[in-house]
From Swiss-Prot:
Protein's recorded name: Putative competence-damage inducible protein
Source species, domain of life: Bacteria
Family from the record: Belongs to the CinA family.
Database matches in InterPro entries: CinA (IPR050101), CinA-like_C (IPR036653), CinA_C (IPR008136), CinA_KH (IPR041424), Competence-induced_CinA (IPR008135), MoaB/Mog-like_dom_sf (IPR036425), MoaB/Mog_dom (IPR001453)
SUPFAM superfamilies, sorted: CinA-like, Molybdenum cofactor biosynthesis proteins
Length: 418
């Protein structure tokens, strides 16, 4: 089924309101296995709406119109659709009764004749009751094309779609997705590595998305059940993870989890919790961002001991008890300083692990290190590890954010290998 969404309202075209209905409907239809091919916005104008309907009829077999069901003269969606289909308008008895109840306790002058328009339907339509408003929606099929009319206010449209429209459109098959998350590889490299799979994709489809510092692959398929979809996903996922990067690293090693709402921080937090480990941190360029991210999770106090924000060399020395001479000798942007910061944070908080971040957020260089140079340390009972990452060509904000992602990834890999 090819679906098309037509939003009716001049206020959308002038930018007075954002068309959130289109996003909601597209997501809802996708979950039902219905593909949305086109989205259109048209003003409150009969001739332009008629021309759009003519175009839509030739390319779509499900046309959903939103907005223009109110009582005023510029609310002309149902009237224009009726004209387009060569049909009359009729009154829905339940909608009329709802109008009667609504105006029963109001002065007589409140119910003007134009209010009756809200109870009208294109002849032959199945009414879609409006649980939160007065304008009734409708659905009808003409010459192989299904037309749906919905109110514009999201507070009215969403309940109508969820409670009335979805049961009528359910076809049995639904759209299922599985999101694979990767860290440590760019989108262009991942797409190049998987180019043959992506070029030849059919079912499931494979869609890459770049996010700040990481890449996701969305696998999508239509199936009658989650079990059927999972069987398809497993085969494709196994093939994806069998590929290697240009550095001969398996994609399975940089794959870290599933889901739209997952994150490296979430994975690291869950591992700390499941292993009963505590963690602390000492941060310089990230200024507490690692610790703040940890604290976002409910129950963080069970694994997060506390930490330090030591932005200057003097504070690194004073708060972490690192000799100032050592810091001056090695520099604040160094593997030595990152290692010492992690070791001292672990010692002072008596935590199982401690992370440190020091580097150059930019835009200027520091100690002959270019912007984006970051050293990350991780201290544990097994010893201290430091890594250097180069986050070039990014804003200060992105450098700090990506540095924190690297820190969580270091925690994740350490816990998995411990």
């Amino acid at each position: 089924m090819k679906a098309e969404i037509i939003a009716v309202g001049t206020e959308i075209l002038t930018g007075q309101i954002v068309n959130t209905n289109a996003q909601f409907l597209s997501e809802k239809l996708a979950s039902l296995g219905i593909d949305v091919y086109f989205q259109t916005a048209v003003g409150d104008n009969e001739s332009r709406l008629l021309s759009i309907l003519e175009i839509a009829k030739g390319r779509s077999n499900l046309i959903i119109l939103t907005g223009g069901l109110g009582p005023t003269e510029d609310d002309l969606t149902k009237q224009t659709l009726a004209k387009f289909l060569g049909r009359e308008l009729s009154f829905d008895p339940d909608a009329v009764e709802k109008l009667d109840r609504f105006f029963a306790s109001r002065p007589d002058y409140a119910r003007t004749p134009n209010n009756e328009r809200q109870a009208q339907l294109v002849e032959g339509s199945t009414p879609l009751p409006n649980a939160t408003g007065l304008a009734v929606g409708g659905i009808l099929e003409v010459d192989g094309v299904t037309y749906v009319v919905l109110p514009g206010p999201p507070s009215e449209l969403k309940p109508m779609v969820n409670n009335e429209l979805v049961p009528l459109l359910s076809t049995g098959q639904k759209l299922y997705s599985r999101v694979l998350r990767f860290f440590g590889i760019g989108e262009s490299q991942l797409v190049t590595i998987l180019s043959e799979m992506i070029d030849q994709q059919s079912d499931p489809t494979i869609a890459p998305y770049a996010k700040t510092g990481e890449v996701t692959l969305r696998l999508s398929t239509k199936a009658l059940s989650q079990a059927e979809a999972d069987a398809k996903f497993e085969a494709v996922e196994k093939e994806i993870l069998s590929h290697k990067t240009f550095e001969d690293q398996s994609l399975s090693e940089i794959f870290y989890g599933y889901g739209d709402d997952n994150s490296l921080a979430q994975v690291a937090f869950d591992l700390l919790k499941s292993q009963g480990k505590t963690i602390s941190a000492a941060e310089s360029l990230t200024a507490g961002l690692f610790q703040a991210t940890l604290a976002d999770f409910a129950g963080a106090s069970a694994i997060f001991s506390g930490g330090f924000v030591t932005y200057s060399m003097e504070e690194k020395s004073r708060m972490l008890d690192i000799p100032l001479g050592d810091l001056e000798e090695h520099g604040v942007v160094s593997a030595f300083t990152a290692g010492k910061m992690a070791e001292q944070a672990r010692k002072l908080t008596e935590s199982d692990l401690a992370v440190s971040l020091t580097g150059v957020a930019g835009p200027d260089s520091l100690e002959d290190h270019p912007a984006g140079t970051v050293f990350i340390g991780l201290a544990s009972a097994a010893g201290t590890e430091t890594i250097k990452v180069n986050i070039a060509g990014r804003s200060r904000r992105d450098v700090r954010k990506i540095a924190v992602l690297h820190a969580f990834n270091l925690v994740r890999s350490t816990l998995l290998n411990s």
